[in-house]
Amino acid sequence: MRYKIKFKVWLEKDKDIVMGLGRDKLLREIDRLGSISKAAKEVGMSYKKAWSFIKAMEKRLGIKLIQTQRGGKGGGGAVLTKEAKNLLNEFEKITKEFEKLTEKLSKNE
């Protein structure tokens, strides 16, 4: 029988999700675009939902993930903190390990 192995990775703390593919994409888009509203639009969610994800992650992890600057003459913006970048790197490593495992298991069928 031929089948394809699939997986979904997320990180939890005290049974609450702190990172998954959607949150990973949101943070990466904030890093790329320098804006929470632009990143939210890019990943197909409302600004309010994006902020709620960020605040929930920060609360659960006990760290600041985003540094924001209010709009105005020079414009606002958002940048990832060092801790957020570390979290993204760790999540990417974990995801890649799962990808390697599924490739290995698929070859052994």
Each predicted region: which residue ranges?
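Short, Lys/Arg-enriched N-terminal segment that forms or immediately precedes the first helix
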Residues: 2-15
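Short alpha-helical elements of helix-turn-helix
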Residues: 17-27, 48
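Short helix-boundary/capping micro-motifs
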Residues: 33-40
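Central "turn" residue of the DNA-binding helix-turn-helix
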Residues: 44-46
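Residues within the DNA-recognition helix of helix-turn-helix
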Residues: 53
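Residue cluster at the C-terminal edge of the helix-turn-helix DNA-binding motif
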Residues: 59-64
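Basic, amphipathic "hinge/linker" alpha-helix immediately C-terminal to the N-terminal HTH DNA-binding motif
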Residues: 68-91
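Alpha-helical linker/hinge and terminal dimerization helices associated
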Residues: 87-106
